[in-house]
Design a protein with these regions (language model features):
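ACP-dependent fatty acid/polyketide chain-elongation machinery
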Residues: 1-84, 91, 95, 131-149
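Acyl-CoA/ACP chain-elongation machinery
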Residues: 33-37, 157-159, 184-187, 208-218
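Active-site-proximal alpha-helical scaffold in enzymes
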Residues: 13, 92-110, 175, 191-218
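Conserved catalytic cysteine-centered active-site region
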Residues: 65-77, 89, 146-205
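Carboxylate/His-rich catalytic cores and anion/metal-binding grooves
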Residues: 119-122, 127-153, 157, 161
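Flexible, low-complexity linker/loop segments at domain and module junctions
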Residues: 1-7, 109-116, 213
């Protein structure tokens, strides 16, 4: 196996916006898990919670590792700041971490190096808050018809979410494409879903000599 030099790192974790914070939290053995909030679930977590496994359409735990109080700064990229500010947090996290890794490596402002750099992004292709909202009108319409028939009232309406940006609908390749464009990376870029083994696949399948390896787990 060929040798790979790690020349830049960054990270964004629950309770840790930098690698230094992450390391200190590990040393101090901090438990940075917490209970889900309405912001995480889109509704009160109590609606979905049921104490006990096996209950249909319910979860038996709302505890997890949630990123809190992260503010994405959309400036300093090769794409419009207003456009980036409207992207799903999945994309914004990827942009932030990639930019910080480039800065840590010393190549953020090196245009030639970035043109010869690619990106391999590990991404679990689960629905995001934004992608769900794009389809909410379909769900609402279906439920609406059933409720109208059940109650015998054709005037009942169930509102859907406000329209989301269409770019937020694609979950597999779009994050890597957006990061590559925003940071002007000129070589091959792609995302793959291999859960915890994603980083191993990325190292094995790296398309260019200089590449990012990002693992994004939600």
């Amino acid at each position: 196996m060929s040798k790979i030099a790690i020349i830049g790192m960054s990270g964004l974790f629950p309770g840790s916006s930098t690698l230094e914070q992450f390391w200190n939290n590990l040393i101090e053995a901090k438990d940075l898990t917490g209970l889900a909030t309405e912001e995480d679930f889109g509704q009160s977590p109590s609606i979905f919670f049921e104490d006990g496994k096996g209950v249909v359409d319910k979860c038996y735990s709302t505890r997890g590792g949630y990123i809190r109080d992260f503010h994405f700064e959309p400036g300093g990229y090769a794409l419009d700041a207003d456009y980036l500010s409207k992207q799903d947090k999945l994309y914004q996290w990827s942009l932030h971490v990639a930019k910080e890794a480039l800065a840590h490596s010393g190549y953020l402002k090196d245009e030639t190096a970035r043109k010869n750099c690619g990106l391999v992004l590990g991404n679990l292709s689960f629905p995001t808050g934004s992608s769900h909202k794009l389809l909410s009108r379909i769900y609402s319409h279906t439920l609406e018809q059933s409720v109208r028939k059940l109650l015998g009232n054709s005037e009942i309406t169930i509102p859907g979410h406000v329209k989301e940006m269409p770019d937020n609908r694609v979950l597999d390749h779009t994050p890597s494409e957006l990061v590559a464009k925003a940071l002007s990376l000129g070589k091959t870029h792609y995302a793959l879903d291999a859960a915890c083994a994603t980083s191993l696949y990325a190292i094995k399948l790296h398309p260019v000599r200089n590449a990012f390896y990002q693992g994004l787990r939600l």
